[in-house]
């Protein structure tokens, strides 16, 4: 299959889908959805006390457990990304305080009311239709110059995936 994607600005982009492409819906979520044992990705701003203040929290589908596990710089200046398993969660003055663990360590994350919380749910190719908001995490340039991807995120319930 092939998709023609209209970008906000710039030329349309054609992307081929691998035979085993994974499609994930991106849906609204809340703090109540952050359960102990959930695998999450948190884009955050480091705080002076060493904790991380969440900007965005993505709750992964169980089939995505382990994706990008660890702690590293994120795509915004001065920010970090932590993909890890929720160990504990406690209500705090500034929001929910969540401790996450990954293979090389753990982080304390503060999730305030201003954090965007979304969840991935398993989807299928039928969701890839004209007008759908999508995000492609990674596309490979093929020898003939075309792009190919094995994963697409598609917004549901008004969500525009990033």
Regions found by a protein language model. Give the residues of each.
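Short, flexible, surface-exposed loop segments at domain boundaries
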Residues: 1-162
């Amino acid at each position: 299959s092939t998709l023609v994607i209209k970008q906000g600005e710039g030329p349309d982009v054609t992307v081929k889908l691998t035979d085993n492409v994974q499609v994930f819906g991106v849906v609204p979520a809340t703090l109540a959805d952050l359960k102990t044992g959930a695998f999450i990705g948190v884009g955050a701003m480091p705080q002076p006390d060493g904790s991380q203040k969440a900007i965005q929290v993505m709750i992964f589908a169980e089939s995505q457990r382990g994706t990008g596990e660890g702690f590293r710089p994120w795509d915004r200046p001065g920010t970090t990304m932590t993909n890890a398993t929720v160990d504990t969660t406690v209500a705090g003055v500034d929001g929910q305080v969540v401790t996450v663990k990954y293979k090389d360590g753990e982080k304390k994350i503060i999730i305030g009311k201003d954090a965007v919380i979304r969840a991935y749910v398993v989807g299928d190719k039928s969701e890839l239709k004209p007008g759908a908001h999508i995000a492609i995490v990674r596309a490979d340039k093929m020898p003939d110059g075309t792009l190919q991807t094995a994963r697409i995120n598609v917004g549901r319930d008004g969500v525009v995936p990033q």
